[in-house]
């Protein structure tokens, strides 16, 4: 019996040593992508975004809730360490002025110092990143709250032509 146990222990030890010598496999996991950002908010000026975890998913939150303050501009910074090409782009619909052109990670979209509310937005991923991840986002709209729910990959969040301010924006990037 002792001889059998010794042989089993030797075999297990040899297997363990072989496994530890295998080359590491690079993983392109969801943890290799993240965001930060800021919003220009009525009365508060530039405010840093905050990261929360909603249902276990990293979520960038911009703006305020329950304070009746308009978001006037946003800036989203993408941290892409996936090895895939691509970035995040967004555009916003502004009071009086309408839609901006698509803006790339790290660039502001909207206005500051003009007292103009954001009313709607669209967000999308580009390049290989868009083939492997979805961007989903939800806005808190004056009077309507969160009733629109989550929208994905360039869909419109918010309203146009209704004079309703965006108060809060939540953004997630999730694997497909």
What are these regions (language model features)?
Residues 29-176:
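Lectin-type carbohydrate-recognition ectodomains
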Residues 1-12:
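Bacterial N-terminal signal peptides that target proteins for export
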Residues 10, 19-33:
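Sec-dependent signal peptide cleavage junction
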